[in-house]
């Protein structure tokens, strides 16, 4: 693990980056608003907001589609795997960019 320094909230950047994913959109928004200095944390906060917000919208859409419940199981499994991977990568100090979402998150974290 790489020591990354402290954030404006007093936590290590890697810890705060991982916490951005803990409760999905909620912690993403919380850290995006509260963190004033760390671009690393802001990146993970925005990526969390877009990822879990998008998955939430997708699950709502699937609820209205006949047999959408079958696909929702796969979406939930993918969401769980992405949740674990993103938290782990952030904790390790990596700026792990998801396809498409990562580029958008990078723009909004500057």
Curated annotation (Swiss-Prot):
Q: Where is it found, in Gene Ontology cellular component terms?
A: plasma membrane
Transmembrane stretches, by residue range?
A: 15-35, 49-69, 70-90
Subcellular locations according to the entry: Cell membrane
Tell me the keywords, alphabetical order: Cell membrane, Membrane, Transmembrane, Transmembrane helix
| Transmembrane as UniProt keyword | yes
Question: Where's it mainly located?
Answer: membrane
* Topology of the protein relative to the lipid bilayer: Multi-pass membrane protein
Q: Which domain of life is it from?
A: Archaea
What does the similarity note say? Belongs to the UPF0132 family.
Q: Per its record, how is this protein called by name? A: UPF0132 membrane protein MJ1443
Supply the source organism for this entry: Methanocaldococcus jannaschii (strain ATCC 43067 / DSM 2661 / JAL-1 / JCM 10045 / NBRC 100440)
């Amino acid at each position: 693990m790489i020591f990354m320094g402290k954030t404006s909230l007093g936590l290590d950047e890697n810890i705060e980056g991982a916490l951005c994913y803990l409760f999905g959109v909620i912690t993403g928004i919380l850290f995006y608003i509260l963190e004033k200095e760390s671009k690393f944390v802001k990146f993970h906060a925005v990526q969390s907001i877009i990822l879990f917000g998008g998955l939430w919208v997708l699950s709502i859409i699937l609820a209205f589609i006949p047999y959408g419940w079958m696909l929702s199981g796969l979406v939930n499994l993918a969401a769980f795997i992405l949740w674990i991977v993103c938290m782990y990568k952030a904790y390790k100090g990596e700026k792990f960019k998801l396809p498409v979402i990562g580029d958008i998150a990078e723009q909004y974290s500057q």
